[in-house]
Amino acid sequence: MESKFAHIIVFFLLATSFETLLARKESDGPEVIELQKEFECNGKQRWPELIGVPTKLAKGIIEKENSLITNVQILLNGSPVTMDYRCNRVRLFDNILGDVVQIPRVA
């Protein structure tokens, strides 16, 4: 029991001796990060009207409305994805019922 208490004390001492990674002075001001796209994509980019639509139907609509889209991925909501940006790709995130739950967009 004493060793557990000692471990807890050491943990709190170590934890309070470090600043958090996100800590900064208020006088530093807000930091703005500007993300740059290497290129602009042509055609329709977003389909907010497809929320709640079955993913297979949504896939067909996207391919019909933007012929430059050659890669429509259907993924379960919360699935890990790569962060690279491709003008020919749209990801459809669905739920277990097979309906679109996030706004499909070129990514």
From Swiss-Prot:
One of its GO terms (molecular function) is serine-type endopeptidase inhibitor activity. Disulfide bonds: none annotated. The keyword Acetylation does not apply. InterPro entries: Prot_inh_pot1 (IPR000864), Prot_inh_pot1_sf (IPR036354). It holds the Pfam family potato_inhibit. GO terms for biological process: response to wounding. Keywords: Protease inhibitor, Serine protease inhibitor, Signal. Residues 1-23 form the signal peptide. Inhibits both chymotrypsin and trypsin. Belongs to the protease inhibitor I13 (potato type I serine protease inhibitor) family. Mechanical damage (i.e. insect chewing) to this plant results in the systemic release of a factor from the wound site. Within the leaves it induces the cytoplasmic synthesis of proteinase inhibitors I and II. This is Wound-induced proteinase inhibitor 1. It comes from Solanum tuberosum.
